[in-house]
Regions:
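Helix-loop-helix
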Residues: 1-229
Length: 229
């Protein structure tokens, strides 16, 4: 299973990263990571758009869900049944907003391996025939930070932009909504950025840079889709 995952995801991403590193002027692995991140975000845009619209729809109907919960507050079974019927009637999948996260998880795992290999220069055995081996990899991002090592600045940026993205979604909530989902979202708005920062602080800065760029891209997409919607 590990070999299969390596062949179908890790190896292609590694080759794409090294190809970008070779063709982008200056041979800066940071620029290659940014370019790779943008390509991945463009590829995931359809699922992100669908998820965001579904999440916005769920927020729009939150008052009706709160009303159903209040109506059946003494009968949890009837409450659950009424909510599921409401979802079916309005053609809502409450779990569809999790799709981008489920897609991103294997990509993140693969990228962790990609950056470990790419930033260490241990790549020769994994390169396709048409991707030249660049030899040593320049891991200094504009000469300011070594992306092969953890960097507290990138960790703080990763957590900070994660908070901004979460805050943008919370701002779409109906005023006064107090449903369970809304309470959990508020908790996650603070928990996830802290967790992201802690994890990023322990990983190579290249992975933190990926998370910073992908979150910035998501914020832009989110703003565009919400404005359009």
């Amino acid at each position: 299973m590990t070999d299969f995952f390596h062949v179908i995801l890790t190896k292609p991403l590694l080759n794409l990263l090294i190809w970008l590193y070779n063709v982008i002027p200056g041979q800066d692995i940071g620029l290659a990571i940014i370019a790779l991140t943008i390509l991945i975000r463009l590829l995931l845009y359809p699922s992100f758009q669908k998820s965001l619209k579904s999440q916005k729809h769920l927020q729009d109907i939150q008052p009706e869900l709160d009303e159903i919960r209040a109506r059946h507050k003494d009968d949890k079974e009837a409450q659950t049944k009424a909510i599921m019927e409401f979802y079916q009637k309005n053609k809502i999948n409450p779990f569809s907003s999790c799709l981008p996260l489920l897609i991103q998880l294997p990509i993140l795992i693969a990228l962790y391996q990609v950056f470990l290999r790419g930033l260490s220069g241990n790549i020769a055995g994994d390169l396709y025939g048409f991707v030249p081996d660049p030899g040593s990899i320049n891991t200094n991002f504009f000469g300011l930070a070594n992306l092969a090592n953890p960097n507290p600045i990138f960790a703080v940026l990763a957590g900070g932009f994660q908070f901004i993205q979460s805050r943008m979604m919370m701002s779409r909530n109906q005023p006064g909504a107090q449903g369970m989902a809304n309470v959990m979202n508020k908790q996650m708005m603070y928990f996830m950025p802290v967790l992201t920062g802690i994890i990023a602080f322990r990983l190579p800065a290249g992975l933190a840079l990926y998370w910073v760029v992908t979150t910035l891209f998501a914020i832009g997409q989110q703003y565009y889709i919400m404005k359009k919607g």
